[in-house]
Structure formats: C-alpha cells, structure tokens
C-alpha cells in the first residue's frame, strides 16, 4: 500500500507572493499551476453491511474519493501561471459551475480518466515526525453499461454521491520527490451551482512524499528525514506541522463523525 | 618530568623533587589551547567526511571558532616564548623507563615527525625564501611585503563591503540617492514580521476534505 508522508500549514493571502519567492529561491524550481475536481462518495446507507466479518474482524466503511484534473482551457483566466492564485479571492473558483456539475454525469469517449482513492486514517503515535497515511489508488479510464457514467459506476460499487470540492493552486516539485502544494479549496453545493470558499482569505499548504510500499522502512525513514529537513529550513517562517489525525479520518459513522 | 630544576644527587624514589621551577602555567595554558584546537579540528574533519554535509553556516561558524583558537594558541606561544625556549625536559629517575620506553621516546622527541617536516619544507619551498643563506634582511623584507599585501587586500575588502547594503530592501546606491520608501528602509530580514498569518486551522480544512463537514460552522455540506 502506498504510504503518504505529509506536513501541513496555512498562510494568509498576503503572504502568497513571498512564499512563492521563498520556495523558488530555496529549491531553484518554478511553481506549476494545478486544478482538480474532487467528489467524495459515501457507502450506500441502504445496504445493511455487517460491522464484523466471518472472522469476527471489524469492518470499517470508508468514503471513496474521486478526482479528475480540470483542463486549463476551462480556467477563466488570461494567464496560466501561479499568479492566477492571487486573484482567486471570491466565493467561487474561476471555473464554470455547469462544467463542474456535468463531470459526474458525462459519459462516452470524451470522458477524462478518474482517479479513485481510499484514504486510511493516519497512523497513531505520539512521537511522529510526519503524518503517515496509507492510500489505495486506482485509475478509472472508462465505465461500461447502458447508462454509463462515473455515477453509475459508483452505484455499482455500492456508493452514493457525497460532497464535492474544487482544489486549485500551485505546486513545486522539490528535490527528493517532495511536492510542495499551495492551494485553495471551494465547496460545490450540488445542482444549484452555488459555491463557497473553504479556504477563505488563505491558502492550504501541504508538503508530501509518496512511498510505494509500507514495508520499505528505509524509504519511509529517508522521506521523513527529507520532510524534516524542509521543515527545518522553513522554520521561523512557516511552521509545517502534523494535523490532528482525527480530521483526516474518512471512515463512516466513526467516533467524531455525525 | 618536564622541569628545569637540577636533579638531586640521590636516586631515591621517595625523594621529594623541587617542582617550583617547572613552567606549569605556560605549559598548562598551551595544553588547554591545543586540546581545544585538536577538538575543533577533529570535529570539522568528522563533519566533512559525513555523507551529507552540515549546513554551510554551521561549517563557517566552526571554521571561525577554529581560527580564533589557532590565533589564541599562537599568541599564547608567543607570550611564553622565552620561558619555553630555555626549558629542557628530562625524565626523573623514578620514571619506569624500561616499561614505558615507547611513551618516553614520544614525549622526549624533539625532531618533527616526517609529515610535519614535509609540510614545513613545503611551506618554505613555496615561500621562495632562501633560509640557508641566512640573509635575514631579505627574509624580513619578504615578511614586510607579505604584511603590506595582506593589509591592501583587507582594505580592498572593507571598501567593497561598504559599497553594498547587506540589509533592507534597497541597494547601497539607491540608499545614497534616497530613492524608495523610507519606511521600507528599516526593514531588516532578521527581525521582520513577514511571518504568514493563519486565517483558519489546517484541521478544519482537512475535516472538510475527508468528512465533508466544516468544524467551524458545524454545517454538513454532505446530504
């Protein structure tokens, strides 16, 4: 299972330019624009799923995350650079909501591939240096059936639509494989076309690194060291920290849920 | 063992020796400085042989500490030059010469070890001075020349240094022409409060991403 090592932080809008300049100067890399649409689906509550399996082991239901990148031609902007991020102060993303709402129902040859992923709750432990989270990810290139769409595909899997959001920002591909992401999030409120800013007046910072195997302790330790090094380098300017693991729990009906 | 007092006639081990003439103060001062210097030199060597180098600023700090210690050693040696030059060490009769012959030869050794001899020879060769000829005037003038070159280089560096502004947002040229916002001129990188503010918590955003709810508003976006 892929292990994602990560550290998080937040900044206000006024600090964006300085942060971009800082990371560019530190890494010698340039920022890359990215945008994606995310849909999180819940397990269908109508199915009576046993809480324990035949071996008396606990069965935990997890939300599933679908992600599709948004092509740049759909962005309502004149310039395709990180500078776009400084102009995204409104309640909605610079993307047509009709387009976003059509994504889940679109079918046929023109459909772009979806990334389907399941995220485990990050590992517990007091002395953790980074947030370690197991991820299972797969790519859905096409769906079959009479009324083919990603929605029907999810229904077949036993999932019902949940909530959706758009993530837009800029990222740096640092050395050692670390991705340094500065992004904004908007929640989409269904067919009404209403949107609201989740990261109002600020940006979410995520520095992460993926290790292909959980058993590859050497790579995990090395990745942890690289992230620690980045944290040390940015110390006194940006405090990269480990978030509360409960906030990254995608399990349904669990403890702090509902 | 190292003492300048004349040896007593009796070779009795219980005999009290007169240590009063041992230049203990000088030797101890030099010993301490040498210990410091060897410690920092071996630390630098260890750091340099590591797989990933330490940060440049810590290396530079170490180097400057080592240089300070080196100059302090040199000045101490200079200070006790006269005392040390007329000090002759010799073993006391009570010293177990047979058992510790190796130690004794090391301690009594006056000749430099081959490596040291080599670099001293190298340095002399490179200086291009003829020490054999004992032309002291020539050597003196060479040293003077060297000193004046150093002074000139130092002057040059100081002058170049003053040409630039190492703090604030403006160049020295801009500062001398009085361009720019005077408020920004007092900006100092070390004490700047350019730290980003946090308009929301990471946890609240992650809760939304993973569970569809905002901790702050407590309203479910999910149906």
From Swiss-Prot, chain A:
Family annotation (InterPro entries): Mediator_Med18 (IPR019095)
Keywords, sorted A to Z: Activator, Nucleus, Transcription, Transcription regulation
GO terms, molecular function: transcription coregulator activity
Gene Ontology BP terms: positive regulation of transcription initiation by RNA polymerase II
Gene3D superfamilies hit by this protein: Hypothetical Protein Pfu-838710-001
Main location: nucleus
Function of the molecule: Component of the Mediator complex, a coactivator involved in the regulated transcription of nearly all RNA polymerase II-dependent genes. Mediator functions as a bridge to convey information from gene-specific regulatory proteins to the basal RNA polymerase II transcription machinery. Mediator is recruited to promoters by direct interactions with regulatory proteins and serves as a scaffold for the assembly of a functional preinitiation complex with RNA polymerase II and the general transcription factors.
Protein family per UniProt: Belongs to the Mediator complex subunit 18 family.
Official protein name in the record: Mediator of RNA polymerase II transcription subunit 18
Organism the protein comes from: Eremothecium gossypii (strain ATCC 10895 / CBS 109.51 / FGSC 9923 / NRRL Y-1056) (Yeast)
Lineage: Eukaryota, Fungi, Dikarya, Ascomycota, Saccharomycotina
Gene name tied to this protein: SRB5
From Swiss-Prot, chain B:
Gene Ontology CC terms: core mediator complex; mediator complex
Superkingdom, taxonomy of origin: Eukaryota
Subcellular location: Nucleus
A GO molecular-function annotation: transcription coregulator activity
PANTHER family linked to this entry: MEDIATOR OF RNA POLYMERASE II TRANSCRIPTION SUBUNIT 8
Functional note: Component of the Mediator complex, a coactivator involved in the regulated transcription of nearly all RNA polymerase II-dependent genes. Mediator functions as a bridge to convey information from gene-specific regulatory proteins to the basal RNA polymerase II transcription machinery. Mediator is recruited to promoters by direct interactions with regulatory proteins and serves as a scaffold for the assembly of a functional preinitiation complex with RNA polymerase II and the general transcription factors.
Protein name stated in the entry: Mediator of RNA polymerase II transcription subunit 8
């Amino acid at each position: 299972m892929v292990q994602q090592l990560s550290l998080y932080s937040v900044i206000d809008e006024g600090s964006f330019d300085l942060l971009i300049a800082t990371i560019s100067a530190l890494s010698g890399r340039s920022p890359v624009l990215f945008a994606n649409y995310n849909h999180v689906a819940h397990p269908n509550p109508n199915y009576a799923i046993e809480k324990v399996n035949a071996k008396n082991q606990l069965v935990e239901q997890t939300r599933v995350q679908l992600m599709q990148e948004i092509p740049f031609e759909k962005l309502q902007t004149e310039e395709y650079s990180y500078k776009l991020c400084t102009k995204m102060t409104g309640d909605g993303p610079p993307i047509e909501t009709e387009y976003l709402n059509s994504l889940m129902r679109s079918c046929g040859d023109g459909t772009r591939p979806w990334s389907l992923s399941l995220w485990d709750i990050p590992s517990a432990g007091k002395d953790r240096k980074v947030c370690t989270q197991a991820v299972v990810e797969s790519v859905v290139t096409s769906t079959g059936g009479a009324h083919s769409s990603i929605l029907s595909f999810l229904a077949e899997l036993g999932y019902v639509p949940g909530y959706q959001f758009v993530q837009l920002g800029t990222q740096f591909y640092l050395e050692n494989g670390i991705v340094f992401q500065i992004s904004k999030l908007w929640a989409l409120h269904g067919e009404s076309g209403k949107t609201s800013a989740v990261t109002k007046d600020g940006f979410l910072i995520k520095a992460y690194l993926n290790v292909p195997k959980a058993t590859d302790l050497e790579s995990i330790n090395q990745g942890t060291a690289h992230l620690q090094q980045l944290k040390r380098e940015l110390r006194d300017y940006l405090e990269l920290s480990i978030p509360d693991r409960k906030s990254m729990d995608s399990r349904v009906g669990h403890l702090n849920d509902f | 063992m190292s003492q300048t007092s004349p040896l007593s006639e009796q070779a009795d081990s219980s005999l009290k020796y007169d240590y009063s003439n041992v230049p203990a103060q000088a030797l101890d001062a030099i010993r301490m400085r040498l210990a410091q210097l060897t410690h920092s030199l071996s630390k630098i060597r260890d750091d340099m042989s590591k797989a990933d180098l330490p940060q440049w600023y810590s290396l530079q700090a170490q180097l400057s500490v080592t240089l300070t210690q080196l100059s302090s050693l040199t000045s101490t040696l200079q200070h006790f030059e006269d005392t040390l030059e007329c000090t002759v060490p010799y073993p006391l009769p009570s010293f177990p010469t047979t058992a510790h012959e190796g130690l004794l030869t090391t301690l009594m050794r006056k000749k430099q070890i081959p490596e040291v001899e080599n670099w001293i020879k190298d340095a002399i060769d490179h200086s291009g001075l003829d020490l054999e000829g004992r032309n002291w005037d020539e050597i003196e003038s060479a040293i003077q020349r060297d000193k004046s070159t150093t002074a000139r280089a130092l002057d040059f560096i100081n002058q170049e240094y003053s040409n630039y502004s190492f703090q604030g947002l403006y160049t020295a040229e801009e500062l001398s022409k009085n361009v720019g916002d005077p408020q920004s001129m007092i900006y100092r990188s070390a004490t700047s409060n350019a730290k980003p503010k946090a308009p929301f918590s990471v946890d609240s955003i992650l809760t939304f991403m993973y569970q569809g709810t905002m901790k702050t508003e407590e309203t479910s976006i999910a149906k």
